[in-house]
């Protein structure tokens, strides 16, 4: 049994979020824990597949198949526990107004993920890992990213969880040209940047 219902992992690009997901997926495989990787866009799903996370789907295709195909649900029936890794979570809206065919509609993407999964996945223990960059702009018409807010899950869904932020960027050499330019820009604008 999982002690909590969700975990939020944040960090800037290059901080190792995808590596954490890959390592967690390896642990799932070792211990026969079911898992599914999801991404907000098709491009992000493709990137994760190319990084070794071959079962990654878009959130929309996941929700569609859960609600439409009973055979799709059967593949989860032999697992006691299941973990969902959801990348690009900073883009997931909940309650925002979107315009489809020039008509305003409310978009409850986060609710769709949560309720569709709990309704259709027959596992006793379901756990969500929301992964994203909290420094990105929030979804349209939002003041913050609901899928990266621990308190939002507690208040809206009554779930228990924890969060962690990766702060060190590993992808770039600290003395790369991009890093130097960014550091100089920040120093010139009186930001607190270590020399």
Predicted regions and their residues:
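Conserved ATP-binding/catalytic motifs of P-loop helicase motor domains
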Residues: 1-195
């Amino acid at each position: 049994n999982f002690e909590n219902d969700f975990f939020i992992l944040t960090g800037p690009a290059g901080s190792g979020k995808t590596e954490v997901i890959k390592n967690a997926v390896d642990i799932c495989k070792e211990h026969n824990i079911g898992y599914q990787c999801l991404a907000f866009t098709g491009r992000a799903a493709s990137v994760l597949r190319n990084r070794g996370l071959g079962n990654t789907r878009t959130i929309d295709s996941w929700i569609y198949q859960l609600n439409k195909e009973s055979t799709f649900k059967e593949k989860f029936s032999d697992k006691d526990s299941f973990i969902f890794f959801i990348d690009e979570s900073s883009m997931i809206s909940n309650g925002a107004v979107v315009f489809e065919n020039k008509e305003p509609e409310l978009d409850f993407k986060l609710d769709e993920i949560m309720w569709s999964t709990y309704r259709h996945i027959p596992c006793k223990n379901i756990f969500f890992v929301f992964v994203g960059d909290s420094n990105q702009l929030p979804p349209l018409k939002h003041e913050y990213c609901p899928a990266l807010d621990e308190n939002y899950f507690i208040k809206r869904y009554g779930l228990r969880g924890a969060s962690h932020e990766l702060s060190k960027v590993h992808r770039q050499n600290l003395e790369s040209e991009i890093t130097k330019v960014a550091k100089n820009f920040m120093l010139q604008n009186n930001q607190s940047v270590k020399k």
